[in-house]
Amino acid sequence: MRTGFDRDLYVRMQSQHINERREQIGGKLYLEMGGKLFDDLHASRVLPGFTPDNKIAMLEQLKDELEILVTINAKDLQRNKTRADLDISYEDDVLRLIDVFREAGFLTEHVVLTQLEDDNYQAMQFIQRLERLGIKVARHRVIPGYPTDARRIVSEEGFGRNEYVETTRNLVVVTAPGPGSGKLATCLSQIYGDHQRGISSGYAKFETFPIWDLPLEHPVNLAYEAATADLDDINVIDPFHLTAYGEKATSYNRDVEVFPLLKTMLEMLSGSSPYQSPTDMGVNMVGSAIADDEVCREAARQEIVRRYFKALVDERRDELDDTVSSRIAIVMSKAGCSVEDRTVVARALELESETGAPASAILLDDGRIVTGKTSALLGCSAAMLLNALKELAGIDPSIDLLSPESIEPIQTLKTEHLGSRNPRLHTDEVLIALSVSAAASDNARRALDQLKNLRGCDVHTTTILGSVDEGIFRNLGVLVTSEPKYQRKALYRKR
């Protein structure tokens, strides 16, 4: 895979720039970390060479000087919001993040629930769960007039109603499972609380996307717009930066909307603001570490198309209108890409048309496309997986990695003893069968050794995947899209 991003340069530059901002601010610094802090899979897809743990690697250089504060929007608990890339709820992701941060040696003791209301039963239950686990919880309330009514917000009737988090270090990283979690409001509330206690503190923002020093409609920035289409976030030219410096910089609507509040609040608390624009608040050095712009552009265009298919599937699965997919269609148009640019789509659809049954296609790293069709023994994704492993291992396509005799007993187990209606093997079942065969078969061993080479490959299926196949592909690091239709008609769908 071609690399478009210099990871080592980024780690050095970013940690240095954060330290420079700390010196500039003085006192305690609340650093809002946008995007995923530990496993930023979106960034790794649109910036080839950016590893999912890049931000943690950078923060490890500051580990002994910082603590991490995790926020979650209480309304996301009511909505049962999930992280699509990991298929876990935001509630569980909060616990997972705390575990990950602690295992890496970061001080992580507090969770802030934002936009909390007394009738939010799910949030109250989560608070009890956190407290039973020994995690300190701060409750931040819905503030009428936020973010426009600065005088009310910066008062006892606004931030004054929020519970204050007693932090112990001078660099506080504020992160969350996803966007819209209230990270900025948490930082501002803490600065207000510090001011009431005579503590000097300031704010800076580390948001990977949009990248401020790339053009507004650069595909990498547009991919972020596609990723947040459900929030109706849009990239904008920072009007405050343009006015103050006469320079164009890329920001996004929520930062621009809340900037007057931040500036007013800092002026109310300390007499002046160090920032003239939302862009000034940022410490993001990602743009400076892009080593090959065209590689990143193409990766971003592919991500936008993947987001489009995901939106279509979500709308079909959850019986939603086409609001999100329509927004992403507009983004695709801006980026100059379409579903035809995802080459596996046409191949999968062609095979489905030829066979009259669901089909799959995978694009290998060297450009070869391998397909899989539905048969009496295998589902199309399982067949495609075996075919891809044979191709990578240089095994003759006519050779069966799994004999019909080894598959049939598994089918009998499924249908006669485990209550399955579908006798065909799924991806997890063929991998287990392949692992068993590897004890006696050199071909099976060689095929299994190629699993690592599937990471980052693109797959398209002509029907919506079941949860098992979806999970296997996710664990293998395969980037899957599907047509927004089910293999069979039914009212009940197992999730």
From Swiss-Prot:
Protein name, entry field: UPF0371 protein CE2832
Q: Which organism is it from?
A: Corynebacterium efficiens (strain DSM 44549 / YS-314 / AJ 12310 / JCM 11189 / NBRC 100395)
Q: Which family does it belong to?
A: Belongs to the UPF0371 family.
What InterPro entries does the record point to? DUF1846, DUF1846_C, DUF1846_N
